[in-house]
């Protein structure tokens, strides 16, 4: 699943490709992806100009003249832009055509992605209803609030970080990387972390996601950016998908367990359960 770094990389790419373009029509081949009333969606999006691009957590935002198009890529969603002729693609489910002849294509092998149209003034309440936590930046991700939320929860720290309420944008890959850097076992309950450990998890969340954005995200299976290019953050992973290999910090063999239904990688020496 694309996590914050991958979604941010897609956002940056699309910003270079489609900003200022006017939508002439939209071809929806898999209507279940559209979470707004289908008729209203097609009616409202016609003639809109893409004014700017944004992101909130793992959500891509297309700011139009008087609406916001919200896109969630889920497991396998991808965007491709074609300046003229669009090749026939098996998994192309939504095609946004522009007046200049270009087309933005949304492809999704799993068909789990979603699109919905919203008035800009409803955007804040939309994300509040999703219980979406703050962005993982020094400005938005408050350490005090994070520590307080941890103290109130008996959830395993990995599961808690994944549920998006503590901080937005983390997924399975980067949670494993954050907890390895912070030397915290993924199955420990949130309220068992010391103040020092909580600070370390907080800081490494910002560091890991920031580095991953710089590297264009991680290409593990099929992820590519808007230009069809792979990310390179996978070259800097320390534990994810490295079960059976030596820990780069202590040379203990990395282990993989199931935690909350998710494959979880950790070093049993560096990340003791305590």
Language model features with spans:
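Phosphate/anion-contacting hairpin/loop surfaces
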Residues: 69-169, 174-181, 189
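Short clusters of hydrophobic/aromatic residues that line enzyme substrate/ligand-binding pockets
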Residues: 45, 129-132, 184, 240
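Catalytic cores of large soluble enzymes that bind and process phosphate-bearing ligands
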Residues: 2, 6, 138, 197
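Surface-exposed binding/hinge segments that line
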Residues: 1-115
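Basic, nucleic-acid-binding surfaces and adjacent catalytic neighborhoods in DNA/RNA-processing proteins
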Residues: 22-40, 54, 145, 149-274
């Amino acid at each position: 699943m694309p996590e914050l770094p991958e979604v941010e990389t897609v956002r940056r790419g699309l910003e270079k490709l489609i900003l200022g373009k006017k939508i002439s029509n939209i071809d929806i081949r898999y209507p279940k992806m559209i979470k707004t009333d289908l008729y209203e969606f097609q009616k409202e999006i016609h003639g809109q100009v893409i004014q700017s691009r944004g992101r909130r957590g793992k959500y891509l935002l297309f700011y139009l003249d008087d609406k916001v198009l919200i896109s969630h890529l889920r497991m396998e969603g991808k965007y491709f832009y074609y300046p003229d002729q669009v090749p026939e693609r098996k998994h192309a489910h939504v095609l946004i055509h522009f007046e200049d002849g270009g087309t933005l294509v949304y492809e999704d092998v799993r068909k789990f992605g979603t699109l919905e149209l919203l008035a800009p003034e409803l955007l804040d309440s939309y994300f509040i209803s999703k219980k979406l936590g703050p962005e993982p930046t020094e400005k938005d991700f408050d350490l005090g609030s994070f520590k307080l939320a941890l103290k109130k929860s008996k959830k395993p720290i990995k599961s808690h970080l994944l549920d998006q309420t503590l901080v937005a944008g983390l997924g399975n890959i980067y949670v494993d990387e954050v907890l390895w850097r912070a030397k915290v076992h993924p199955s420990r309950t949130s309220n068992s972390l010391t103040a020092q450990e909580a600070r370390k998890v907080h800081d490494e969340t910002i560091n890991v996601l920031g580095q991953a954005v710089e590297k264009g995200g991680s290409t593990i299976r099929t992820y590519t950016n808007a230009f069809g290019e792979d990310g390179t953050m996978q070259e800097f992973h320390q534990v994810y998908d490295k079960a059976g290999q030596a820990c780069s910090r202590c040379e203990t063999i990395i282990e993989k367990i199931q935690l909350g239904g998710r494959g979880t990688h950790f070093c049993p020496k560096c990340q003791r359960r305590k």
